[in-house]
Amino acid sequence: MALDRSDGLNSLGFAKAPADTRVVVAMSGGVDSSAVAAQLADEGYDVVGVTLQLYDHGAALAKKGACCAGRDIHDAARVAETMGFPHYVLDYENVFKDAVIDEFADSYLAGATPVPCIRCNERVKFKDLLETAKDLDADCMATGHYIQRKMGREKAELHSAADAARDQSYFLFSTKQEQLDFLRFPLGHLESKAETRALAAKYGLSVADKPDSQDICFVPNGNYAAVIEKLRPGAADPGEIVDIDGNVLAMHRGVIHYTIGQRRGLGIGGLDDPLYVVKLDPDTRRVIVGPKEMLSTRTVPVREINWLGDTPFDSQQEWQMDVKIRSTRPPRGAVIRPVSATEAEVELIVAEEGVSPGQACVFYAPEGGRIFGGGWIHKG
């Protein structure tokens, strides 16, 4: 599990013995962070496990595969007991609601399609938890994310995971340089999830065969609309489904049930050609549908840019890079034109469908897998 290793440095990149290196491990109770904690403890590091209690939404606590639910806290504690290191649970429910859940609900109300996992990493795990790690006199904080931290000529760099199928770089683009300096990602170099499970089995951890977490952690059974309705009464008020000319085709059961590019579940039949959601208008509660070709675009406005390059983002008129506009899509060629230090117009070389406000646009080097940051797609 070597990171930044060279002569005189331990596997976490420090010039001292593992026993003299304190590392806080962010433990979700899943197999990934558990394997990280176990291996580091086995290597002799001064490991401190920390689990965040993020929510208590009734059914969410019992949701199989949820992150940091009641059973997951128990699993993390068992791993710590097995490997002989201290483990703490911190109540971050109010922080999580203010920083992540409220924005998630409001984004859907505004017609966007948010990615709460990015905000959680940005505003909770890599902010408050990282500061807690420093308060515990840790030298670094390790997580179970599948991404690589590599040392460049001048500073630590963020790189895609060796296992492309597990790569989580899309969800970590907003990591700041000062955070990256303190973070470690011991699983990023592994070729497959099977290697992680083998590590957990090697140490006799009960989570070795635990299923991966699925969907959004605080949304029971994937029913995000029910969560939004609970948080924002009236969010599911009905409205009209109209075509691009404003003709009413059907009624819908709330804008929050729809996303850009959606085809299924529109309740529109008897048409010669399929229709897709091409726009959401929350002010009029209208869902606008049109032909598939209307989903294609080459221009993507991006703001709140976090830049991890070696020179200032706005020091050039344009950057030739690859970008990823959804977590499930591969990076594609683009020209990024800075408007300011935190805003840009991204021109896709080949048009893509379903570019949605609220999603992230992540910047990658054309070769080598380095992540240069990214920003949030918004309405132009």
Swiss-Prot record:
Marked site (Interaction with tRNA) residue numbers: H145, Q359
Alphabetical list of InterPro entries matching this protein: MnmA-like, MnmA-like_C, MnmA-like_central, MnmA-like_central_sf, Rossmann-like_a/b/a_fold
Binding site for ATP: A26, M27, S28, G29, G30, V31, D32, S33, L52, G144
EC number: 2.8.1.13
GO cellular component, one term: cytoplasm
Principal location class: cytoplasm
UniProt keywords, alphabetically: ATP-binding, Cytoplasm, Disulfide bond, Nucleotide-binding, RNA-binding, Transferase, tRNA processing, tRNA-binding
Reactions listed under catalytic activity: S-sulfanyl-L-cysteinyl-[protein] + uridine(34) in tRNA + AH2 + ATP = 2-thiouridine(34) in tRNA + L-cysteinyl-[protein] + A + AMP + diphosphate + H(+)
Region named Interaction with tRNA: 166-168
Entry annotated with the keyword RNA-binding: yes
GO molecular function: ATP binding; tRNA binding; tRNA-uridine 2-sulfurtransferase activity
Superkingdom of origin organism: Bacteria
Family matches, as NCBIfam families: PRK00143.1, trmU
Xref: PANTHER family: MITOCHONDRIAL TRNA-SPECIFIC 2-THIOURIDYLASE 1, TRNA 5-METHYLAMINOMETHYL-2-THIOURIDYLATE -METHYLTRANSFERASE
Protein family (similarity comment): Belongs to the MnmA/TRMU family.
Protein's recorded name: tRNA-specific 2-thiouridylase MnmA
